[in-house]
């Protein structure tokens, strides 16, 4: 009954939000970051995948193996006609366990390996960026040339301190090798430090391959710390971000996979509403 209600909600949202004759922004259901359902995955991977499958989710970005193995998760995905397109790992594992990371990514069936945090003492500075660039170029080359995997760095807000005529994020874009390093744009962690996600995508249309879909509670002021209370994640379309403008820019770029990420403790209430919002968007 719960799953039936969710499906009815999604259909109702789609019918009410779409304008007849307009093309939906998403032909296929956007994916999901496992971090959204981290508490549930930690208790029961199979049951959590069942929940996501019932909502129409097929595309997964796993940021953790949750006490299982890559092979076990792959089997559970295959049994549900789901797939993992991106595998998120920690910075240290990327650098020191590159081959193990690659093996797990290949077993999962992922095309991308992603890192979402650069260890640093705040504030993030040029020396941090320089080290990350060197590590990303080196690991990215191994992943691409030896395993046909694409490395992506996921921005987290602290990279936008001024540098030269731009920011440290611009520096990282300029100094990383496009053949080996791509990027995943987290739109909340682009907006939070004062940047325009749509403008950033237009500036680097070929470097972004993945996107985290998030929204920030109205009234919350940002900074460059890379952190905000999890309660500030809200249902897509109800916060501060201009989702239609961002997605318009994204659709004209090289972004291939979109993942819903909701860090809120009430994600299970918010995610169905976010899905309905996305399905109701039209071009």
Listing of model-derived features with the role each one plays in the protein:
Residues 3, 21-34, 40-55, 166-169, ...:
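Histidine-acidic metal/acid-base catalytic patches
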Residues 50, 58-59, 91-182, 268:
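Active-site acidic/histidine proton-transfer and metal-coordination neighborhood
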Residues 2-11:
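Sec-dependent signal peptide recognition
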Residues 61, 86-88, 114, 152, ...:
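Conserved beta-strand positions in the central sheet of alpha/beta enzyme cores
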Residues 37-43, 59-71, 89-97, 120-124, ...:
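Acidic-and-aromatic substrate-binding clefts and catalytic sites of carbohydrate-active enzymes
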Residues 82, 110-111, 147-149, 252-256:
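A short helix->loop->beta-strand "cap" motif at the edges of active sites that frequently abuts
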Residues 18-112, 282-283:
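N-terminal pre-domain/capping segments
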């Amino acid at each position: 009954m719960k799953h039936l209600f969710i499906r009815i909600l999604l259909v109702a949202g789609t019918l009410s939000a779409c304008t007849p004759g307009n093309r939906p922004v998403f032909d296929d259901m956007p994916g999901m970051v496992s971090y959204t359902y981290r508490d549930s995955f930690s208790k029961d991977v199979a049951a959590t995948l069942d929940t996501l499958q019932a909502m129409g989710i097929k595309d997964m970005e796993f940021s953790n193996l949750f006490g299982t193995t890559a092979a076990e998760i792959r089997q559970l995905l295959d049994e549900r006609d789901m797939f993992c397109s991106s595998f998120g790992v920690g910075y240290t594992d990327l650098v020191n366990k590159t081959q193990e990371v690659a093996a797990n990514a290949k077993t999962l069936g992922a095309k991308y390996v992603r890192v979402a945090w650069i260890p640093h003492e705040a504030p993030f500075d040029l020396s941090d960026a320089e080290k990350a660039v060197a590590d990303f170029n080196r690991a990215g080359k191994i992943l691409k040339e030896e395993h046909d995997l694409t490395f992506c760095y996921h921005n987290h807000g602290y990279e936008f301190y001024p540098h030269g005529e731009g920011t440290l994020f611009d520096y990282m874009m300029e100094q990383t090798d496009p053949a080996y390093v791509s990027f995943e744009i987290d739109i909340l962690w682009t907006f939070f430090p004062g940047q325009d996600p749509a403008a950033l995508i237009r500036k680097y249309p070929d470097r972004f391959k993945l996107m985290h879909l998030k929204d920030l509670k109205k009234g919350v002021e940002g900074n460059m710390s890379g952190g905000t209370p999890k309660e500030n994640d809200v249902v897509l379309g109800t916060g501060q971000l201009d989702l239609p403008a961002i997605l318009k820019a994204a659709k004209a770029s090289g972004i291939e996979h979109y993942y819903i990420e909701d860090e809120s403790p009430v994600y299970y209430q918010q995610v169905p509403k976010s899905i309905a919002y996305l399905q109701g968007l039209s071009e």
